[in-house]
Amino acid sequence: MPMPPDDSALSLLPDHPLAAHNTFGIDATARFAARITHAAQFAALHRDPRVAHLPQLVLGGGSNVVFTRDFDGIVLLDEIAGRRVVREDDDAWYVEAGGGETWHAFVAWTLEHGMPGLENLALIPGTVGAAPIQNIGAYGLEMKTYFDSLVAVELATGRSERFDAARCAFGYRDSFFKREGRGRFAIVAVTFRLPKRWTPRLGYADVTRELDARGIAPEAATPRDVFDAVVAIRRAKLPDPLELGNAGSFFKNPVIDAARFDALRARVPDVVSYPQPGGQVKLAAGWLIDRCGWKGRALGAAAVHDRQALVLVNRGGATGADVLALARAIQDDVRKQFGVELEPEPVCV
């Protein structure tokens, strides 16, 4: 009788080029790479003498990383697939997706199966497994709103652990996995709780304007209408990484307290802002960058996109150092003009 396949077996790819595995399209090489299609492969890493001693980097869609050098370790390409409803009750569906699933495809799948809620997060690049790390968000919705739990493998021990929202400690574009847990875990599956009573989130003017352009009143909008509107907005504003390398929004929108905001508004009355809980105020980083005159400008092969100042792009041949030099120049100008610190979203490796 033939032996069943070993789901934990690891096939190593030596001197693996990474340009196709990061949306900036930055050239870098990993000492090794491995395609991970089963959680058991993550769990077996610490027992594999070929790689157990090496630095490890889990990579999903590569939409939140800037390679500044070659990676002298093993890059683990998370390709764990699968989408399913694990259970439902009178109030909600509980939907699980593999960490390697493409985020946008997963959002589209939930809508196609009559389970709305995630439509404001349509077309965000990356994978399901990367979404909790960053607590992705757009157009008035953060991933944590519908998050239920996730399963992650601790790379040093191979032990699987389940994390609820409290343990993930989500913040604005932040989580445990971006702080204390950074580099320690691989997220293999995420479960979302999607309420059966749909709550449309139409607080952003861009969304209501797009609906209006389509002849749809906000109160009449369906989940599919919102999904289509968000997709159209993102495609109009953001470059396709396959055509122009980028990592989406490069900087977080800074959040400041009311006193600092009042002082800023006294100097800059038209500053774009959004009230936040606890009296804080979120500023539009793209507006700050644009006001500093950076939209469309370049430093070498790295540039600020000409339609969205929050997006840095690779015009061809840019290195990670080029991107970081541009980012620092922008940060310096925003700090000098507005007294505000911009924090990058991508992880630099």
From Swiss-Prot:
Catalytic activity: UDP-N-acetyl-alpha-D-muramate + NADP(+) = UDP-N-acetyl-3-O-(1-carboxyvinyl)-alpha-D-glucosamine + NADPH + H(+)
First-level EC class: oxidoreductase
Entry GO CC: cytosol
Single GO molecular function: UDP-N-acetylmuramate dehydrogenase activity
Cofactor: FAD
Every FAD-binding PCMH-type domain range: 24-197
Active site: 173, 249, 345
Role of this protein: Cell wall formation.
NCBIfam families, per the entry: murB, PRK00046.1, PRK13903.1
Full protein name: UDP-N-acetylenolpyruvoylglucosamine reductase
Gene label: murB
